[in-house]
Every structure is written in structure tokens, then in C-alpha cells.
Amino acid sequence: LNGKFVKNFIDMFGDTPMAQAEALRYHGTTLLDAAAGKLPAVVLRGGAYLRHGMMGADVLANLVSAAHAKELYVILDMDTAEPECWAGYGADAVTVCPYGGSGCLEAGEMLPIAAVRTGGQGQSLMAGDRALWLSVAEQMARRGAALAVSTGYSLDVRDVRRVCPGAFLLLEDCDGENALPAFDDMGHGALATDSALQYAAEPATAVEEAVRAWKQWVTVV
């Protein structure tokens, strides 16, 4: 969060974990208000809250509940190998790390979203004649997982859609033009995230502009 923004809470609570947690609570609530009725889902990055201990965990739980009250689908971004540990937060889906085996898919009632392609250097590794991440994506999709793919290139999106034609895709920071191959003719099959929205000076306006831009590429029927 912006230092000036956090300072307002430090002035109220002192330089304490409570100040950091309350800043996150206010920031998150503002973003949920902006998203309500305009976006289908929100992604809450668990680490940003849990780094502030029990108070941060409390804020995370409150934001999950608040998002559900606004009829938003909640994805808890943990990139975890043990998703059942986070079931108590009540999120609808959780990101999991698939490279430790299929045990990461034991997510209880949450949808496991396997983070098969990240921004790390390991994405260039090969498995036979194709990228390792595509091989992992295929295995995860066969077991019913959705797939998180971090890319800005339509070729990557085409590749994963070809290998996993029925998998639901979570595309991280991919613009509408490059994300287009992920969607079917009805505009279904994928969800795109836009991390820039959380830093917007006017979140409500930024959300409206983002929705307008996406509708140029994808129309949900």
C-alpha cells in the first residue's frame, strides 16, 4: 500500500500491526465496493494479509465474508501445496502449487486452481517436445483443476487451450486481445485478473474503464 495511505492509520493506531491491518481492511473494502455489481470475482492474495499475523488473518476472513455479501466469487491466492489448511476462510477457490504432486488438489469444497505457469524462470523448462508447464497443465486438468496461467502472449493461451480444451482458465494480467483464445463463442471458459486495479486512485472509475475495455474483446452471453 502507498506509504502516505498507511501513514493515516499509523497516526491513529501507532506504528503497530493493527495499523497495517486496518489499512488493508479499508483498502480492501473500498475495492470490494468498486467491484460489486461490475465484476464477477475478486482475488485476495493471502500472503499480503497473513504477514501481519492474527490481525491480518482476521482482515482476510472479514473481506471474504464481505465479498460474498456483495455476491462476488472469491479466489484465495495462496499458491499452496496444502489447500485444506485454508478452508476455514470460506473462499470459493484457492490457487495451488501443482509441482509437488496431485495432493495439492485436495481442497475440500473449494475449487483448486493450479498455478501451472508463473512469471518465474522455470517456465522455459521442457518436458520432451513441449514446455513443462503445459504437461503439468494437462495432468491437473485431467484431475478436474482449473488452471492459473501468467502470460501476456496469445500463443501461450492458445497452447494451453489446445492441450486443455475443457479447463477453466485464470489468466493473470493478460489483456483482452491476447486472452481471447481462452474464451468460447459465448464468452465463457476463463477469467482474467487485472492487478493494476488495486492501485488505482479512483477504483470505481478504474473498474468501469476496465470492463468497458474488455467488452471490446469478450462479450458474455
Feature map (PLM): residue ranges:
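A C-terminal functional module that forms or caps the active site or interfaces directly
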Residues: 25, 147, 152-197
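Conserved anion-binding
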Residues: 3-6, 10-11, 15, 82-148
